[in-house]
Amino acid sequence: MIESDAAVRGHIEMLASRVFQTETKWPHFRLLLRNLIDWSNRLAPDATVVSLERTLLYGGVSLFAPLFRRQHFISVDSSPESARDRGAYNAGMIDDPRCIPVPFTRHAPMNATGLQAGVADLVTVPNLVHHVGDQQGLFAEIARLLKPGGTAYVFEPLVRELHQMPDDYLRYTPFGMAAELAKAGLEAGPFELEGGPFSAIAYCWTQALEYFPEAERSRMQQWFDDDHFPQLMQWDEKYRDNLVRDHTQFPVSFSIVARKPA
């Protein structure tokens, strides 16, 4: 059964408010949601989408499958073995009646999915490239999965703490990512940037708050939520350009697309 538009809108609202907390904590994830919604609306109903994900931390649920309900969607769970030991520690984020729980399709490493070559019109890698040790193998697998003329979509952070250690390997700039996609035989297209220096400060504050003792953290959290975060977001919208140095930007995340030659 294809979920209704209203149900999918509810799922997207749940992702924004509960999982990615775009209005209260991590505004740079707006780019990811905006891009995937756009792709789901643009792709033909008979298109095949392969999403390389980590679903075990959400109890084996694909966050993005409901968006592509009209396409053939394959969720490849690429959670490492360490994820099984950690369990579904983010499952509470999707404990919401708006969530449409679609389980992952298969479990496989990102660099060896076992899927047929040339199966995908679109391959998405949402916020996971930095968790893959075999970078060359990952990009080669993305290229292998794509049909001629197919597109790869990658979302990555630029400002991020070390997390899910030890499975956290590197950070790319959009230019570095474009170079790696080109090495795999893909034609890197345009990229988008999200956030500015003030949302970077906000992100660092969300991390720093976790280092306060619990009693002090509650007080600081209220100050951050009520006063500092709203002010930072206002500044982030108002002051977009570096007025001192040219050729300089301070985004918090980016997305990029790359096409497999026809």
Where are these regions (language model features)?
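Conserved beta-strand signature within the Rossmann-like core of class I S-adenosyl-L-methionine
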Residues: 150-156
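A conserved beta-strand element that flanks and buttresses the S-adenosyl-L-methionine
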Residues: 124
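Conserved S-adenosyl-L-methionine
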Residues: 186-197
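Class I SAM-dependent methyltransferase SAM/SAH-binding core
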Residues: 48-112
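A short glycine-rich, Lys/Arg-flanked "PGG" loop and its adjoining helix->strand segment in the class I
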Residues: 136-148
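Class I SAM-dependent methyltransferase Rossmann-like catalytic core
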Residues: 1-45
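A C-terminal cap/extension of S-adenosyl-L-methionine-dependent methyltransferases
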Residues: 199-262
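Acceptor-substrate binding/catalytic loop of class I
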Residues: 160-180, 200
